[in-house]
């Protein structure tokens, strides 16, 4: 079927675009009456107002014409459990709760350009994705990516952290690392050349082979100053001090990570947004920056499966307010680790600036709250 357009005048102009790859009624069911069409799919002045489950093709794949849709409006797909893929190459803005509760959504394609719909700075209002746009979608969904489009890797890595994507679909993953990296039985044990990470371009990204399951003790610690991001789809364990004092490290993407050792990310003042959907155990001082000159910049941290948090894990001097997502109340060690530490049981989160904790209503019931707060965290519910 050729691309078709159906225009209705109902006091305002509604435009519905069928897909170029549309194959008869199996691809897209068009309701028979104008009233039903207007309630299922609405596009007004380039804004997708709604796209109901009844209009979703039987294969679950929705494609939006880039000439017709530039914004996905608030709640446009909310609760659509039939949606499996969304292809929207012309979209630059995604409003609140746009895909909230789309529990079958596994692939998102915004055209795989230089960057996803994400503002690089707060002053840029031409492109954005609302904080809760993808809440309630699978943690193992993927975002399309094209390494030949001159992409900004750092913006993509921040986007998939904040909006809970497991992979960049299309990223080039090496089958092995150069000889400067020592790997044995799936464990990255050491880096033999201190210049191994030089010449990685303005993004400073290291992409690990998927067969690397563990990063050994102190491998990257205190060695590299132009190392901005690391991407490893297979990493499950990180041993003590692996990234300690990597002062330039901004993004860490390990979607299968289950445990991290002591001081793994200590004195990493430039870390910004992290999502570890399967992380269960965090050892002592893992993100601690007590006494550091540079403040902590972590503004977003998602740990929905964490069960055990060691002492002093997030203690330090913060520059910004932090948003943290947790599941049920974890076991937290509040033991002071030095004599001059706060003795009031706050040391593990000491120094955080008015932190916000997001939990589901069912998980909230597991928390012990004092005056509506949990160790200084204001509680908000994910609904």
Question: What spans do the regions from the language model cover?
Answer:
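A structural signal for leucine-rich repeat
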Residues: 121-123, 132-136, 159-163, 265, ...
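Solvent-exposed adhesion/ligand-recognition segments of exported proteins
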Residues: 368, 375-383
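Sec-dependent N-terminal signal peptides
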Residues: 6-14
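Structural signature of tandem-repeat unit edges
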Residues: 37-44, 55-71, 81-93, 103-128, ...
